[in-house]
Amino acid sequence: TQAAFEADHGMRLMAGTEPEMMWLRNKEDGTPSVEGLSKPYCYHIDQFSEFQPLIHKVMEYAGALGLDMIQGDHEDAPGQLELNFNFDRAEITADNLTTYRQICKQVGREMNAFPCFMPKPFMGVSANGCHHNISIWKGDQNLFDPPDPANPMMPGDVGKWAIGGILKHLSALTAISSPTVNSYRRLWDTGFWAPVFADWGFQNRTTALRVSAPGRFEYRSVDSAVNPYLSLNALIHAMRDGIENQIDPGPPEERNIYEAMKAGKDVKRIPMTFGEALEALDNDEVIKASMPGEMYKVFRHYKWDEWERYCATVSDWDVEEYLDILP
């Protein structure tokens, strides 16, 4: 997909990710608990310092394997760290994210900790996201750079069309970038900045797409369970559709999206269950084409099976809610 995008348009996707995950304590028998190694204090310096031996080990292995580590912080869930590496071509970033996850798994073995990439292991605190930071380049030119110095956050036409393409296909994209039943717990646990509305804005964390800095935007409808090869490939297809058809995303929403809706704005919600997202993907030929050959059939088979097995399960909630019901 990247090669075809370059051949047809001379453009390439550059991407960076924000791989949040939680470090959990192991039980005495070596199996993971649901207890974080730290408390849910965001950007807490002392908690970040407590993680230094673990972080240094991750950094050591990452450097040895060619990852350019640039930044890290403690996020606001138990044991939640985000350690970032530099952006690159989309296919290289996908390789790097996969390598980073394997590094964390190995460090966990060595330090008796469990690296958890489950999107929502706890309710009432932030989930594990994996925001994708996106730009499109042509040679040495970033096509997302703002053409008007007086409006430094507004991308040029190509950037706006790319955003328009993603908004058009966002429901189908969600099935790929939020690819588990558990992913949608993240969307229902409100108040923790998970996006549920198909809109875009400048520094607006209530929308699914956010222009976070001049020259790039943040795709927020994605979590820690994502397969980056599939998500970045699908984003190229969505943006290509937007560019080729000059899809207008509309003006950026600068209000809190909930305030905008109270004022009468009609905003589409993204799918709120995995089944709804999979139905949207079934009906989107552009995004389905991002998984060529037998790939989409295989993805569809296993993901619909996952959803149907969940629907056929009696949960603890069912028992607690209905066991003693007397109609």
Report residues per predicted region:
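Glycine-rich, acidic/polar active-site loops that bind/position phosphate-bearing ligands
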Residues: T1-P327
